[in-house]
Amino acid sequence: KKYRDGLLVGSACEAGELYQALLRNVPDQEIARLVNFYDYLEIQPLGNNAFMLADEKHDMINSEEDLKEINRKIVKLGEQFKKPVVATCDVHFMDPQDEVYRRIIMAGKGFEDADNQAPLYLRTTEEMLAEFEYLGSDKAEEVVITNTNKIADRIDVMAPVRPDKCPPVIPDSDKTLTDICYRRAHELYGDELPKIVEAVSYTHLRAHETGRNL
Protein backbone atom coordinates (compact mmCIF):
# COMPACT_ATOMS: atom_id res chain seq x y z
CA LYS A 1 0.00 0.00 0.00
CA LYS A 2 2.92 2.34 0.66
CA TYR A 3 3.80 2.42 -3.06
CA ARG A 4 0.28 2.03 -4.45
CA ASP A 5 -0.10 5.59 -5.73
CA GLY A 6 -0.05 5.73 -9.52
CA LEU A 7 -0.37 1.97 -9.97
CA LEU A 8 -3.18 -0.26 -11.23
CA VAL A 9 -2.96 -3.71 -9.70
CA GLY A 10 -4.51 -6.78 -11.33
CA SER A 11 -5.10 -10.19 -9.77
CA ALA A 12 -2.65 -11.91 -12.17
CA CYS A 13 -2.69 -15.48 -13.47
CA GLU A 14 -3.24 -18.84 -11.76
CA ALA A 15 -0.16 -18.17 -9.65
CA GLY A 16 -1.84 -15.10 -8.19
CA GLU A 17 -3.19 -15.17 -4.65
CA LEU A 18 -6.85 -14.83 -5.69
CA TYR A 19 -6.78 -17.79 -8.08
CA GLN A 20 -4.87 -19.84 -5.53
CA ALA A 21 -7.36 -18.92 -2.82
CA LEU A 22 -10.22 -20.15 -5.01
CA LEU A 23 -8.38 -23.41 -5.60
CA ARG A 24 -8.04 -23.86 -1.84
CA ASN A 25 -11.67 -22.97 -1.14
CA VAL A 26 -10.71 -20.39 1.46
CA PRO A 27 -13.50 -18.67 3.45
CA ASP A 28 -15.58 -15.98 1.75
CA GLN A 29 -14.22 -13.34 4.12
CA GLU A 30 -10.68 -13.97 2.90
CA ILE A 31 -11.81 -13.95 -0.73
CA ALA A 32 -13.48 -10.58 -0.14
CA ARG A 33 -10.29 -9.17 1.38
CA LEU A 34 -8.26 -10.28 -1.62
CA VAL A 35 -10.72 -8.98 -4.20
CA ASN A 36 -10.93 -5.58 -2.53
CA PHE A 37 -7.15 -5.18 -2.79
CA TYR A 38 -7.14 -5.25 -6.59
CA ASP A 39 -8.14 -2.60 -9.10
CA TYR A 40 -9.26 -5.25 -11.58
CA LEU A 41 -9.55 -9.02 -11.74
CA GLU A 42 -8.07 -11.23 -14.45
CA ILE A 43 -9.06 -14.41 -16.23
CA GLN A 44 -6.99 -16.32 -18.80
CA PRO A 45 -7.70 -18.76 -21.65
CA LEU A 46 -8.21 -22.38 -20.64
CA GLY A 47 -5.00 -23.51 -22.34
CA ASN A 48 -2.95 -21.34 -20.01
CA ASN A 49 -4.02 -23.41 -17.02
CA ALA A 50 -4.55 -26.80 -18.66
CA PHE A 51 -1.34 -28.06 -17.03
CA MET A 52 -3.32 -28.37 -13.80
CA LEU A 53 -5.35 -31.22 -15.30
CA ALA A 54 -2.33 -33.51 -15.02
CA ASP A 55 -1.00 -32.04 -11.80
CA GLU A 56 -1.83 -34.08 -8.72
CA LYS A 57 -1.43 -30.99 -6.54
CA HIS A 58 -4.61 -29.55 -8.07
CA ASP A 59 -7.05 -32.30 -7.19
CA MET A 60 -10.09 -30.05 -7.62
CA ILE A 61 -9.24 -29.45 -11.31
CA ASN A 62 -10.21 -32.53 -13.30
CA SER A 63 -11.62 -31.13 -16.54
CA GLU A 64 -11.84 -28.05 -18.72
CA GLU A 65 -15.23 -27.43 -17.14
CA ASP A 66 -13.49 -27.04 -13.78
CA LEU A 67 -11.19 -24.43 -15.31
CA LYS A 68 -14.20 -22.63 -16.76
CA GLU A 69 -15.87 -22.67 -13.36
CA ILE A 70 -12.90 -20.92 -11.74
CA ASN A 71 -13.12 -18.18 -14.37
CA ARG A 72 -16.87 -17.92 -13.83
CA LYS A 73 -16.29 -17.47 -10.11
CA ILE A 74 -13.86 -14.63 -10.80
CA VAL A 75 -16.40 -12.99 -13.11
CA LYS A 76 -19.07 -13.26 -10.41
CA LEU A 77 -16.70 -11.78 -7.84
CA GLY A 78 -16.12 -8.86 -10.17
CA GLU A 79 -19.85 -8.28 -10.40
CA GLN A 80 -20.31 -8.65 -6.65
CA PHE A 81 -17.51 -6.28 -5.66
CA LYS A 82 -17.84 -3.88 -8.60
CA LYS A 83 -14.41 -4.75 -9.96
CA PRO A 84 -13.81 -4.87 -13.73
CA VAL A 85 -12.84 -8.32 -14.95
CA VAL A 86 -10.30 -8.35 -17.78
CA ALA A 87 -9.43 -11.29 -20.03
CA THR A 88 -5.65 -11.38 -20.39
CA CYS A 89 -3.31 -13.69 -22.32
CA ASP A 90 -0.50 -13.75 -19.73
CA VAL A 91 1.76 -13.25 -22.75
CA HIS A 92 5.28 -14.70 -22.57
CA PHE A 93 5.98 -14.70 -26.33
CA MET A 94 4.47 -13.06 -29.40
CA ASP A 95 3.50 -15.92 -31.72
CA PRO A 96 2.63 -19.59 -31.03
CA GLN A 97 5.82 -20.89 -32.68
CA ASP A 98 7.93 -18.70 -30.41
CA GLU A 99 7.33 -21.09 -27.52
CA VAL A 100 10.52 -22.88 -28.55
CA TYR A 101 12.59 -19.98 -27.19
CA ARG A 102 10.90 -20.12 -23.80
CA ARG A 103 11.39 -23.89 -23.86
CA ILE A 104 15.13 -23.42 -24.38
CA ILE A 105 15.38 -20.86 -21.58
CA MET A 106 13.43 -23.04 -19.14
CA ALA A 107 15.43 -26.13 -20.05
CA GLY A 108 18.62 -24.19 -19.42
CA LYS A 109 17.31 -23.32 -15.97
CA GLY A 110 16.64 -26.96 -15.20
CA PHE A 111 12.84 -27.12 -15.50
CA GLU A 112 11.89 -30.76 -16.08
CA ASP A 113 8.62 -29.75 -17.78
CA ALA A 114 10.24 -27.29 -20.20
CA ASP A 115 8.86 -29.20 -23.21
CA ASN A 116 5.28 -28.78 -21.96
CA GLN A 117 4.70 -25.17 -22.93
CA ALA A 118 1.36 -23.49 -22.34
CA PRO A 119 0.00 -21.38 -25.24
CA LEU A 120 1.11 -18.08 -23.72
CA TYR A 121 1.15 -16.14 -26.99
CA LEU A 122 -0.52 -12.83 -27.86
CA ARG A 123 -4.01 -13.66 -29.10
CA THR A 124 -6.10 -11.46 -31.37
CA THR A 125 -9.39 -9.97 -30.24
CA GLU A 126 -11.28 -12.58 -32.26
CA GLU A 127 -9.29 -15.39 -30.67
CA MET A 128 -9.96 -14.05 -27.19
CA LEU A 129 -13.69 -13.71 -27.86
CA ALA A 130 -13.73 -17.34 -28.99
CA GLU A 131 -11.81 -18.39 -25.86
CA PHE A 132 -14.45 -16.90 -23.58
CA GLU A 133 -17.61 -17.64 -25.53
CA TYR A 134 -18.69 -19.97 -22.70
CA LEU A 135 -19.39 -16.82 -20.66
CA GLY A 136 -21.94 -15.72 -23.24
CA SER A 137 -21.34 -13.26 -26.07
CA ASP A 138 -22.15 -10.14 -24.03
CA LYS A 139 -19.92 -11.06 -21.10
CA ALA A 140 -17.13 -12.21 -23.43
CA GLU A 141 -17.18 -8.83 -25.16
CA GLU A 142 -17.17 -7.10 -21.78
CA VAL A 143 -14.09 -8.88 -20.44
CA VAL A 144 -12.18 -9.01 -23.74
CA ILE A 145 -12.93 -5.56 -25.19
CA THR A 146 -14.86 -3.17 -22.93
CA ASN A 147 -13.02 -3.62 -19.66
CA THR A 148 -9.65 -3.97 -21.36
CA ASN A 149 -10.11 -0.56 -22.93
CA LYS A 150 -11.31 0.92 -19.64
CA ILE A 151 -8.08 -0.13 -17.99
CA ALA A 152 -6.01 1.10 -20.94
CA ASP A 153 -7.75 4.49 -20.80
CA ARG A 154 -6.64 4.89 -17.19
CA ILE A 155 -2.97 4.46 -18.06
CA ASP A 156 -0.91 7.52 -18.89
CA VAL A 157 1.32 7.28 -21.94
CA MET A 158 4.90 7.99 -20.95
CA ALA A 159 8.41 7.11 -22.03
CA PRO A 160 11.15 6.10 -19.59
CA VAL A 161 13.70 8.01 -21.67
CA ARG A 162 13.74 11.42 -23.32
CA PRO A 163 12.41 11.51 -26.90
CA ASP A 164 15.54 13.18 -28.30
CA LYS A 165 17.71 10.15 -27.35
CA CYS A 166 20.40 12.38 -25.79
CA PRO A 167 23.41 10.79 -27.54
CA PRO A 168 26.84 11.71 -26.20
CA VAL A 169 28.61 14.51 -28.07
CA ILE A 170 32.11 13.39 -29.08
CA PRO A 171 34.37 15.59 -31.24
CA ASP A 172 34.85 14.29 -34.81
CA SER A 173 32.61 11.30 -34.11
CA ASP A 174 31.20 11.39 -37.67
CA LYS A 175 34.67 11.15 -39.18
CA THR A 176 35.68 8.46 -36.71
CA LEU A 177 32.63 6.39 -37.60
CA THR A 178 33.31 6.79 -41.33
CA ASP A 179 36.95 5.75 -40.93
CA ILE A 180 36.01 2.68 -38.89
CA CYS A 181 33.34 1.59 -41.37
CA TYR A 182 35.55 1.88 -44.44
CA ARG A 183 38.65 0.49 -42.76
CA ARG A 184 36.74 -2.64 -41.81
CA ALA A 185 35.17 -2.85 -45.27
CA HIS A 186 38.62 -2.79 -46.92
CA GLU A 187 39.87 -5.44 -44.48
CA LEU A 188 37.02 -7.71 -45.52
CA TYR A 189 36.79 -7.00 -49.26
CA GLY A 190 40.13 -5.55 -50.34
CA ASP A 191 40.94 -2.28 -52.08
CA GLU A 192 38.11 -2.49 -54.60
CA LEU A 193 34.84 -2.36 -52.71
CA PRO A 194 31.85 -3.92 -54.51
CA LYS A 195 28.23 -2.91 -53.97
CA ILE A 196 28.82 -3.32 -50.27
CA VAL A 197 29.91 0.33 -50.36
CA GLU A 198 26.27 1.29 -50.74
CA ALA A 199 25.38 -0.65 -47.60
CA VAL A 200 28.25 0.93 -45.68
CA SER A 201 27.25 4.39 -46.82
CA TYR A 202 23.61 3.79 -45.92
CA THR A 203 24.49 2.47 -42.46
CA HIS A 204 26.69 5.47 -41.79
CA LEU A 205 24.03 7.87 -43.05
CA ARG A 206 21.31 6.35 -40.88
CA ALA A 207 23.56 6.44 -37.82
CA HIS A 208 24.26 10.11 -38.44
CA GLU A 209 20.60 10.99 -39.04
CA THR A 210 19.38 9.28 -35.88
CA GLY A 211 22.05 10.81 -33.69
CA ARG A 212 23.74 7.53 -32.82
CA ASN A 213 27.29 8.80 -32.88
CA LEU A 214 30.34 7.10 -31.42
What are these regions (language model features)?
Residues 13, 92, 204:
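Histidine-centered active-site/metal-ligand motif
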Residues 84-96:
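Short acidic/histidine-rich active-site segments
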Residues 1-80, 99-104, 143-146, 176-182:
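Extended substrate/RNA-proximal surfaces in nucleic-acid metabolism proteins
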Residues 107, 114-151:
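Phosphate/diphosphate-binding loops
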Residues 61-65, 116-119, 139, 172:
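Alpha-helix capping and helix-loop boundary segments enriched in small/acidic/polar residues
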Residues 85, 101-103, 107-111:
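Catalytic nucleotidyl-transfer cores of nucleotide-processing enzymes
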Residues 45, 136-207, 212:
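Non-catalytic structural connector segments
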